[in-house]
Amino acid sequence: MASLLTLPSLSLSNPSASAAAAGAGAAPSLRLRAAFRCWALRRAGGGRWAAAGAIASPNSVLSEHAFKRLQLSDEEEEEEEGAYGSDEEGVEAVGGGEGDEDELAIARLGLPEQLVSTLEKRGITHLFPIQRAVLIPALDGRDLIARAKTGTGKTLAFGIPMIKQLMEEDDGRSVRRGRIPRVLVLAPTRELAKQVEKEIKESAPKLSTVCVYGGVSYNVQQNALSRGVDVVVGTPGRIIDLINGGSLQLGEVKYLVLDEADQMLAVGFEEDVETILQQLPAERQSMLFSATMPGWVKKLSRRYLNNPLTIDLVGDQDEKLAEGIKLYAIPLTSTSKRTVLSDLITVYAKGGKTIVFTKTKRDADEVSLALTNSIASEALHGDISQHQRERTLNGFRQGKFTVLVATDVAARGLDIPNVDLIIHYELPNDPETFVHRSGRTGRAGKAGTAILMFTNSQRRTVRSLERDVGCRFDFISPPAIEDVLESSAEHVIATLRGVHTESIQYFIPAAERLQEELGPNALASALAHLSGFSQPPSSRSLISHEQGWVTLQLTRDPGYGRGFFSPRSVTGFLSDVSSAAADEVGKIFLTADEKVQGAVFDLPEEIARDLLSMELPPGNTITKVTKLPALQDDGPATDSYGRFSNSDRGFRNRRSRGGGSRGGRGGWDSDGEDRFRRGGRSFRSDNDSWSDDDFGGGRRSNRSSSFGGRGSSYGSRSSSSFGGRSSSFGSRDSSRSFSGACFNCGESGHRASDCPNK
């Protein structure tokens, strides 16, 4: 227990002495330490920290699990009161001992009243875990390497102890013009530097804080430094320029912070950092903060830090995302991404802020331009001037537009409150980038949503991302048109509620005339127009995502004969009911629910409308679906997951892993890479034929045939597929007699449409 917090000035082995030090005559910093010690000891419960990985010198690691161990229930606290009565008295001397949360309230930690007041005005009343972990070691002057999840309050973790010490140094002293900085904060991007400056200014308005970065006037920054400054925040390039120009002197820096340290010390930044470190006094306190901390960063960090204490609230656990972020993944084709994007934003952002991340500047511009037709959006990337960058970020923060399309320049350090949705338009290059992108939402304990777009060829990468980050995606389909319409209407209604009453008065006469003329349709027309749907929306396939197609579901009551066990039986049924539907049918997939013997398939919108109006043989039902049911190839495979597990739903001259459309679940055989197993049937990659027990007498077909979709699956319109215009199965060929069985009565020799018993 003596090494629990590694504080040489007060020993935990004598809690009574620590409590006594918290009396009225103790200094604020001493009272803070005493309160924290007594709280930690009492909550430890007689050595219970050992299992959680207590801090040990010299390079200690404090795990997040240790902090979770501190959060005991009220019942446990009451049980421990008798054993730790003297410690309880010490806490009361600090502030009454009204509970653990109160003991770690900002107001009860001995911080300067001015700092407490400004933090409370910002709604900050208690410490977050990273702030808790850093506070005491930082006040003791320890060098630190701190790691925590994105969006958990790292800026104030180093800001609070530094501000406290600067305020205490300045107490009773006059402000000296031309003073040189005592704090230097290095940040990898202009956006992060400005965020840090904003946090410090809002928390300590009486301290002079200057932010320096490239892309803006050099003279303005020179003048600000010449007037005297306490804290300098900036990017390495501009800081070096100011040092070389004689405008920035670092001889009195007592505190150095490297924020997003893994980027600061990456290739290309290390030399800049070393150049700056050469200008700093040897006697200083250095702290590195980052959401990710690879081993090689720690190695480099130890060159610049003195016996650093490592505070790691992530540890070796895979999950690095903040809790509260709901993750979705959606498989799409490259051509359907932009069409689906606006619908995803409409349904999942619900009128809130969205950041869409792209890989290239060109994509950012093009996606933003495409979205502008339906949703207000702007692009942010490296080619945009600093002035325009700031206008864009301010407009996004203020809600002047709701969608920001950005390259990864905005992923690190960009602090925009209340971002509801993150969309990865392209897969990130690495897990760390995914974590930082997604971390723009769900910040400070709030809920958020992140959606990953990927193509069929990227499934293995998505699986690797799940494994590396330790997360799980919910796989979704594009929103149905009905969902888009509903979300659009809700957003418009919320917007209408915000219209000023004085503005409404000007439009009442016109509204009354329109109401008399159109009745309820007047308001409905206004909602449709404001939602962007002045014209009827075009349907979109839930399978291929193509506009103008409708996905239908066919089911059969088990009491009415054999069910649909293959796409062939579906095309056969359609040919009996509607020759147009049989000719134009798109991809066909069987549903996974064995109790409901059915299938889903695509049809052009007009043909689907006609089919839905037709009378069907008894026991059969065709309905339009707004969400795909579970399909027979939804099961996991080696490198595929979600409901779209085949690259093209077919076998066009390549191996296709995952379950297929032939009526049975399958996967790779455990005894070899080259054998693919499907519900008892096998497909060998070294053989150009495949066994097909379900398609009538062991018919053999070359692998290059296509089954099931427009170009690559059963029910295709190509000449080599079931149910197509030139197909030998399921089409109405007047030159051949019908040899199958009627789907109505079960007798052979005639179709259901010609059945005498219907």
Swiss-Prot record:
MF terms in GO: ATP binding; ATP hydrolysis activity; RNA binding; RNA helicase activity; zinc ion binding
EC number: 3.6.4.13
Family of this protein: Belongs to the DEAD box helicase family. DDX21/DDX50 subfamily.
Chain ranges of zinc fingers (CCHC-type): 740-757
Localisation per UniProt entry: Plastid, Chloroplast
One Gene Ontology cellular component annotation held by this UniProt entry: cytoplasm
Coiled coil: none
Residue positions of motif Q motif: 104-132
Biased composition range(s): Low complexity: 703-737
Record protein name field: DEAD-box ATP-dependent RNA helicase 3, chloroplastic
Reaction catalyzed: ATP + H2O = ADP + phosphate + H(+)
Lineage, broadest ranks: Eukaryota, Viridiplantae, Streptophyta, Embryophyta, Tracheophyta
Transit peptide: 1-62
CDD domains: DEADc, GUCT_Hera, SF2_C_DEAD
Annotated motif DEAD box, positions: 259-262
Biased amino acid composition, Gly residues: 658-669
Biased composition (Basic and acidic residues): 673-687
Keyword set, alphabetical order: ATP-binding, Chloroplast, Helicase, Hydrolase, Metal-binding, Nucleotide-binding, Plastid, Ribosome biogenesis, RNA-binding, Transit peptide, Zinc, Zinc-finger
Residue stretches of biased makeup (Acidic residues): 73-91
Chain segments carrying region Disordered: 71-97, 625-737
Any GO BP: Group II intron splicing
The species this protein was found in: Oryza sativa subsp. japonica
Residue intervals of the Helicase C-terminal domain: 340-485
Domain named Helicase ATP-binding: residues: 135-311
Function: Nuclear genome-encoded factor involved in ribosome biogenesis in chloroplasts. Binds specific group II introns in chloroplasts and facilitates their splicing. Required for normal development of chloroplasts.
InterPro entries (alphabetical): DEAD/DEAH_box_helicase_dom, DEAD_box_RNA_helicase, GUCT, Helicase_ATP-bd, Helicase_C-like, P-loop_NTPase, RNA_helicase_DEAD_Q_motif, Znf_CCHC
